[in-house]
Design a protein with these regions (language model features):
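Glycine-rich N-terminal segment of FAD-binding domains in flavoprotein oxidoreductases
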Residues: 25-49
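Class I SAM-dependent methyltransferase SAM-binding "motif I" and its flanking Rossmann-like core
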Residues: 124-168
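Glycine-rich beta-strand-to-loop/alpha-helix junction loops that act as flexible
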Residues: 33-38, 117-121, 182
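N-terminal glycine-/serine-/threonine-rich phosphate-binding loop
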Residues: 1-31, 91
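Short acidic/glycine-rich loop or secondary-structure boundary segments that cap or lie
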Residues: 67-68, 123-129, 133-136, 188, ...
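ATP/nucleoside-binding phosphotransfer catalytic cores, i.e., glycine-rich phosphate-binding loops
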Residues: 169, 173-225
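Ligand-binding beta-strand-loop-alpha-helix segment within the catalytic cores
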Residues: 53-116
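A glycine- and small-aliphatic-rich helix-loop capping segment at beta-alpha/alpha-beta transitions
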Residues: 45-53, 130-140, 195
Length: 225
C-alpha cells in the first residue's frame, strides 16, 4: 500500500487529484464513494475543480438501514457534499433487501474503477466493521459504537444500529482504492492498517493485499508509522 503523508489539506488535495486523473482519462468511470466526514475536503476539492463528472457512475459504499428521515441518509449527505453539484445522475445506493442485486449492478456497470474510502478509528472501511469476512460482498452489518459516534452525530440519542455496506471482497475487486485518514485519533488504526499484520480485526489492513491501494494521511494520523 502506497502512503502519502503531509498536511491535512495536502492529503485531501492529493486524494482529489487521483480521482480527477481518472475522470479526465476515463470520463465514464465507475466510482464507489463513502460519505464519511473524513472525505468532506476531498469532495470540496472535486467540486471546485471544474471537472466534468456528468458521465460518471457512482455506487455508494455504505448506507444506514431503517432511517425514516431521508435527509439523514448517507445518500443525502453525499448528494449535498458532491453529487448534486457535480451533476452526477447515475447514482446507486445499497439497500438491505437487495444486497445481491447491488453486486449485480456493480458487475453490470463493468466493475468499480476507483473506491474512495476513509479509515475509521477502529480500522473499519465503509461500514465493514472489525471481523467482517474477507470474502464478504454487499451485506447488512451492525454498526459498532465507534461508527455510531463518528458518523451518526446528527441522530442525537437514537443513532441507527445497522448499516448496509459493500464488502471487503467487493473492494478488493475494484481497480484502485484510495483511503483517507486524518487526525491523531486515527493514528493507531493507521499504524495497524499499514504496518500491522493483515487481519479481519482491522479491515483497513486487508487493503495491504490490494494491488493498487493508496493511503493519504496527515502527520497526526501517521504519527505511529
Amino acid at each position: 500500500m502506497k502512503v502519502f503523508t503531509g498536511s491535512a489539506e495536502a492529503a485531501l488535495n492529493k486524494a482529489a487529484e487521483a480521482v480527477l486523473s481518472l475522470v479526465r482519462t476515463k470520463p465514464d468511470c465507475v466510482l464507489a464513494l463513502s460519505a464519511s466526514s473524513q472525505l468532506d475536503g476531498v469532495y470540496a476539492a472535486l467540486r471546485e475543480s471544474g471537472a466534468d463528472f456528468s458521465r460518471c457512475t457512482v455506487f455508494l459504499a455504505e448506507e444506514f438501514v431503517n432511517v425514516e428521515d431521508a435527509s439523514l441518509t448517507r445518500r443525502a449527505k453525499l448528494e449535498a457534499a458532491f453529487l448534486s453539484q457535480a451533476g452526477i445522475s447515475r447514482v446507486h445506493c445499497p439497500d438491505a433487501a437487495g444486497c445481491e442485486g447491488y453486486e449485480a449492478e456493480i458487475a453490470s456497470a463493468g466493475g468499480i474503477d476507483l473506491a474512495l474510502l476513509a479509515i475509521g478509528r477502529n480500522g473499519r472501511i465503509a461500514f465493514d466493521e472489525p471481523l467482517a469476512a474477507f470474502d464478504s460482498t454487499t451485506h447488512v452489518t451492525k454498526l459498532t459504537e465507534s461508527a455510531q459516534q463518528e458518523e451518526c452525530a446528527a441522530f442525537g440519542a437514537n443513532p441507527p444500529s445497522q448499516g448496509v455496506t459493500v464488502g471487503i471482497h467487493t473492494l478488493m475487486r475494484c481497480r484502485r482504492a484510495l483511503l483517507v485518514a486524518l487526525g491523531s485519533e486515527r493514528a493507531e488504526a493507521v499504524h495497524k492498517a499499514v504496518a500491522g499484520r493483515t487481519h479481519i480485526s482491522v479491515p483497513a489492513s486487508l487493503m495491504q493485499l490490494h494491488l493498487n491501494a493508496e493511503l493519504f494521511t496527515d502527520e497526526a494520523a501517521a504519527a505511529e508509522l
